[in-house]
Amino acid sequence: MLSALLLGSLLAAGPSENPTLETRLAPLAKDHKGKIALAVKNLETGESYYRNADEVMPTASLIKVAVLIELYQQAQEDKLKLTDRVRLRAADKVPGSGILTEHFSDGADFSLRDAARLMIAFSDNTATNLVLDRVGVKSVNRRMEAWGFPNTRINAKVYLGSTTSVAPERTRRYGLGSTTAREMVELLEQLQMSERCRPFCKQAILNHLAKNADKDKFKRFLPADVVVMHKDGSTRDTRTDAGLIHTPAGIVAVCVLTTDNKDRRWHSDNAGNLLCARVAKEVYDHFASTKEPKTR
């Protein structure tokens, strides 16, 4: 009788009370109408989940993380100063996301640090190109390769692929940049663990990522007080997001890459946006449900 009661209680509890990352995330990936790659890693415990994580995918503006890192590494190496001034010219203005093109006058003068703020907080394309003019597209790629990320590459200045591409075939295939979900999570891990950056450099980069204004993707379904340090990207058929999410069980690096998406609407409820948001929510809920997750 006692054994029957115990068996009944176990069955009632069910296996879904504390679902695994795979149980939470695999259905989201399966239901998405488009190509998807995922990588998740708890940086304190090592618990992880990967799906198509080594497939090279377009980044859209997510590649601006690599540009930001190169800027701060060159500052760390005394190749430039973050207080160096840049002057906005009419010829510098490109379309797309951001505020410089529409709201700043020709001749506006500001620091490289402020250009970086605009590049990350508002994904400003013009600001990104101003930073790239100083650090160099090829320098970003050399840095990523030296750090062990050969597939994390920027191919050209934003909206200037026809005249500034350093890899025309990659530009045609991937657009602005490319990466893999695994490489992006490992890059975020190296950044968080200060394996490559001095503390001031690391903290400055993370502060930029924490001020990303996008609320359509990772931050969308998370509690307002959750710290999310991330960069997202969007093109007509691509949605991406990658960052560090603070959970009760530690900091978790997450990357979601999607492309060839059926939903190509420029709308906050785009299916790619919602997928990024749901992945972040499932990851947070998983690690909020236990402070001692499994390591594998």
Regions found by a protein language model. Name each.
Residues 46, 58-86, 119, 254:
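Active-site SXXK
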Residues 13-55:
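Beta-lactamase-like hydrolase cores
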